[in-house]
Amino acid sequence: MKVLSKLKPAPGLWLHKAPTPKPGRDEVLIKIKKTAICGTDLHIYKWDEWAQKTIPVPMHVGHEFVGEIVEVGEAASALAVGDRVSGEGHITCGDCRNCRAGKRHLCRYTVGVGVNRPGAFAEYLVIPAKNAYKIPAKISDDIAAILDPFGNAAHSALEFDLVGEDVLITGAGPVGLMSAAIARHVGARHVVITDVNDYRLALAEKVGVTAAVNSTKTPLTETMKNLGMTEGFDVGLEMSGNAEAFRSMLTVMNNGGKIAFLGIPPEPFAIDWNQVVFKSLLIKGIYGRRMFETWYKMTNLLLSGLDISPIITHEFPMKDFQQAFDVMLSGKTGKVILNWEQ
């Protein structure tokens, strides 16, 4: 089969041939239809400090996908050949305290598809059957291919009650944009998103935000005044990992405000803890998706009419992966799809 891999400890990815894997008794073999490029894949492509410390070489990469089951292990009775699936990319142990309590997203021994074990940038992928998720017919292949990051957005956005609330999102990358779409869909009053990338702020307008703010040009306080906000934001969703963005968020949160923090800072940074203490702010770290409660919720958000298609901006045949990564590296994209059937 054709595979896109990190074959040597250097920038880039390489397309090559590899043996088609065989599923074990509790696994499924999936023929990949489409994959999407994640920020994690960019880290691996660039071979930055995180990738050098984390990724074994060689490694088939990629973890956002949709495909069709073509072989089922003897113990995987809940699935069948022909099922169209995406999959949870976090493989958990099943035996630790959190796994046994039904909190698999908190497993201390999580292994990542395309990070610690062979990934989805391949014609075929093997994952545990319990990690495969059947896709309703009304959800397109393009949307099914981005359910993994959509799950990050849903986990973050739905962590706190948003109905009637004023919501601030820092970071208009794909997950921030999807979070904004969710907040609007479930009934937030004002949804304000900040970034420094005008291309992505324009995408934010397409998903229905109240205001898309370039934080280098317009103070948040000015936007709040224009919206008639007299207090502060009730809910914050930090998606950027940027220290200054988070510090700015803290200054405009209402007393008793709640923050879901998904962005990954490149290094530790200081904040004004007086903002946290005297405002009685609640800050909740978010990682991955609740298995599989988040999957149920995000599927039904889509089936109830939530449209995240404007976030998908480019699609390339798999053979043109280099062009796809070049576009991603430009910063002028939303989600980028690789088609493995072309």
From Swiss-Prot:
GO CC annotation: cytoplasm
Pathway annotation from the record: Amino-acid degradation; L-threonine degradation via oxydo-reductase pathway; glycine from L-threonine: step 1/2
SMART domains: PKS_ER
DNA-binding recorded as keyword: no
Site description Important for catalytic activity for the proton relay mechanism but does not participate directly in the coordination of zinc atom, residues in chain: 148
Binding residues for Zn(2+) 1: 38, 63-64
First-level EC class: oxidoreductase
A Pfam family matched in the record: ADH_N
EC number(s) from the headed UniProt entry: 1.1.1.103
Annotated SUPFAM superfamilies: GroES-like, NAD(P)-binding Rossmann-fold domains
Residues annotated to bind NAD(+): 175, 195, 200, 262-264, 286-287
Similarity-based family: Belongs to the zinc-containing alcohol dehydrogenase family.
Annotated GO MF terms: L-threonine 3-dehydrogenase activity; zinc ion binding
Record note on cofactor: Binds 2 Zn(2+) ions per subunit.
Function: Catalyzes the NAD(+)-dependent oxidation of L-threonine to 2-amino-3-ketobutyrate.
Compartment list: Cytoplasm
Alphabetic keyword roster: Cytoplasm, Metal-binding, NAD, Oxidoreductase, Zinc
Catalytic site: 40 (charge relay system), 43 (charge relay system)
UniProt protein name: L-threonine 3-dehydrogenase
Keyword Oxidoreductase appears in the UniProt entry: yes
Known cofactor(s): Zn(2+)
Main localization of the protein described in the UniProt heading: cytoplasm
Organism of this sequence: Coxiella burnetii (strain RSA 493 / Nine Mile phase I)
Oligomer and partners: Homotetramer.
Catalysed transformations (reactions): L-threonine + NAD(+) = (2S)-2-amino-3-oxobutanoate + NADH + H(+)
